[in-house]
Amino acid sequence: MSTLPTKAKVVIIGGGIHGLSTAWKLSQTYKNENDVVVLEKKDTAAGASGIACGVVRNNYFQPAMRELMAHSVSVWESDPKAFKYNPVGYLQISPEVMHEDVATIYAQQKAIGYESDFIEGEKDCMKYMKGMFDDWQAQGITSVLHEKKGGYAFNKDSIKALENKSTSNGVKVVKGIKVTGFKRGSNSKAVTGVETDKGIIECEQVVVGAGPWVRDFWNMLELPKPANIK
């Protein structure tokens, strides 16, 4: 385990894809040693990031996701070798019950210039699929959305690449350390430090990138139980 610094500008909790991608991005602004410190309870990619399926796509029904996912794909494309990213594209092959929804996704992709093809009709879909896989046999397919970008990556290798990109820019990743609480300002609720089982690290800002464990930190921070969405 690395030694815990006594202070940092930003402390990030969690060594998965959220924590390390944030660290990498922040390292482009904060360039001094220990400006950005990542605290990880076990090891990088030890949680959900290490068991993710690895598919990289822009195939979500929510319109708000479209440009965000297009940006995400471009990050994967920026260094495919390091990220162990394979840009083979992505296929959504669907029966009639999904036709309308998939057509909506295609329209949204087209509106932002995201390259994809949309094939409709059972006959044309069969022809298209056999053009790629001559032993294709699935019946009842009435739409194929073929994203020309996207593909897949090897999850743990990808997270390791994020760690390497971060640490090469001066980020310190401390592993085997457990966050136990937060230090507050004397006259406010502002967080001024992170308490751990290895001591306290003072900081100006905290980023919680703990994935499914975010509830524990939410409770430590005594934030409201209900969240009202307007």
Language-model-detected regions and their locations in the chain:
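Conserved Rossmann-like nucleotide-cofactor binding loop
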Residues: 18, 44, 213
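Gly/Ala-rich phosphate-binding loop of Rossmann-like dinucleotide-binding domains
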Residues: 23, 27, 165
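Helical element adjacent to the flavin cofactor pocket in flavoenzyme catalytic cores
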Residues: 145-205, 209-216
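Glycine-rich beta-alpha-beta "Rossmann" dinucleotide-binding loop(s) and their flanking helix/strand
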Residues: 216-230
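Glycine-rich FAD pyrophosphate-binding loop
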Residues: 27-49
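Dinucleotide-binding Rossmann-like beta1-alpha1 core, especially the glycine-rich loop
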Residues: 53-132, 141
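Beta1/beta-strand and adjacent pyrophosphate-binding region of the FAD-binding site
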Residues: 3-18, 37
